[in-house]
């Protein structure tokens, strides 16, 4: 009996020792896991009280714009696309609360941008500070972004807000991430890269880059950006991403540029089903000559043209005639305007690229334009800075030239 009791005591003692040991190992494992998580910088833990505070603020703020969203213009398709007017009304309403507010509109002017500018200037000075920004998407989603700088590292506490079927706001997520690197440019762009999972933890590369224009463009630059460069961009034609002038117009990809000039002239996209057998010469040449100083004879010589059918070839963009590049995703932005002695105007344009590189001037080029009194204009040339020409990927013509 005594032996049995001693054995029970020894077993109990051993159990207690193992429990303490395992508990210590578990605690150590949790500490190591927590340290590893903070080292990675993403999916960081959010204090329960802070998370609840953020969620409640989001619901209160976004509830102010629920009627604007509910009755606003959401487009005619199955996917919601809010009109610029609706987005601007939502932006203005939240801005009344004093928050900086941006939207997904190209060349958007941030409301209450002074607060974000002050925050970033204090970060540059090494001061501990924070700022909250609301970001409105044309899809109807709202993001609350709280940036915190501790004097050394910057963090982003982000919350996403959507809508239920009754147009009530619902918080879809709250996340906390360290910002791996950031900068605030002279032009007023806040550029940063978030810490994100990397291979082999994930099978595909995750892009944590983001660009936010804090200091708005001047009204003149905004208008000229919308009128002269945004309709073209860099993806599917070479008007803005190659060197050319009135003495060297043969390198332009006329067959690709046509659909963008068509959109500029008529205010609607080209219907590809209408031109399966090519574009009639008169239509093609009329559109091209409206925006470029070329003759019909020159277009027929330099573009892909069928003399027998008197049509110009056209094809949709696809993997067979386009190579994806960072530049192709960039947003052209007019940053300076110079009036020339001959009456023409030269626009200094920066290619703002968010994808992976977060660069507010991937390339800089000068676009010369001839504006007429009736409001029409022609492009006369484009020159890329000599030290940046190497950043231009080789252009693939939409349709192979013979």
Segments (PLM) and residue ranges:
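Bacterial N-terminal signal peptides that target proteins for export
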Residues: 2-12
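C-terminal motif of bacterial Sec signal peptides marking the signal peptidase cleavage site
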Residues: 21-24
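Bacterial signal peptide processing site
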Residues: 26-28
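Mature, Sec-exported extracytoplasmic domains of Gram-positive
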Residues: 30-402
């Amino acid at each position: 009996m005594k032996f049995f009791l001693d054995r029970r005591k020894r077993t109990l003692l051993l159990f207690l020792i193992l429990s303490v040991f395992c508990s210590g190992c578990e605690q150590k494992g949790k500490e190591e896991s927590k340290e590893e998580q903070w080292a990675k910088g993403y999916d960081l833990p959010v204090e329960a009280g802070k998370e609840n505070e953020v969620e409640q603020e989001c619901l209160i703020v976004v509830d102010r714009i629920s009627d604007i969203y509910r009755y606003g213009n959401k487009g005619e398709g199955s996917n919601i696309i809010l009109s610029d007017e609706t987005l601007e009304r939502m932006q203005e309403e939240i801005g009344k609360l004093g928050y900086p507010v941006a939207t997904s509109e190209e060349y958007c002017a941030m409301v209450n941008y002074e607060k974000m500018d002050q925050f970033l200037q204090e970060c540059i000075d090494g001061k501990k500070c924070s700022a909250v920004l609301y970001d409105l998407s044309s899809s109807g989603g709202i993001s609350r972004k709280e940036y915190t700088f501790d004097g050394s590292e910057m963090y982003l506490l982000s919350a996403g807000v959507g809508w239920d079927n009754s147009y009530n706001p619902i918080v879809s997520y709250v996340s906390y991430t360290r910002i791996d690197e950031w900068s605030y440019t002279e032009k007023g762009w806040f550029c940063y890269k978030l810490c994100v999972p990397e291979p082999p933890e994930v099978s595909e590369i995750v892009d944590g880059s983001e660009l936010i224009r804090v200091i708005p463009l001047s009204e003149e630059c905004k208008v000229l950006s919308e009128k002269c460069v945004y309709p073209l961009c860099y993806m599917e034609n070479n008007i803005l991403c190659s060197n050319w002038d009135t003495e060297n117009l043969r390198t332009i990809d006329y067959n690709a540029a046509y659909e963008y000039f068509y959109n500029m002239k008529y205010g609607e996209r080209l219907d590809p089903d209408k031109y399966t057998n090519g574009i009639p010469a008169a239509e093609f040449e009329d559109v091209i000559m409206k925006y470029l100083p070329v003759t019909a004879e020159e277009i027929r010589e330099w573009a892909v043209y069928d003399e027998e059918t008197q049509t110009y070839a056209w094809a949709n963009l696809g993997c067979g005639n386009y190579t994806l590049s960072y530049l192709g995703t960039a947003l052209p932005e007019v940053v300076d305007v110079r009036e020339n002695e001959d009456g023409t105007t030269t626009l200094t344009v920066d290619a703002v690229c968010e994808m992976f590189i977060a660069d507010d001037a991937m390339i800089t080029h000068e676009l010369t334009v001839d504006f007429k009194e009736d409001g029409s204009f022609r492009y006369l040339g484009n020159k890329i800075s000599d030290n940046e020409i190497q950043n231009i990927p080789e252009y693939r013509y939409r349709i192979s030239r013979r």
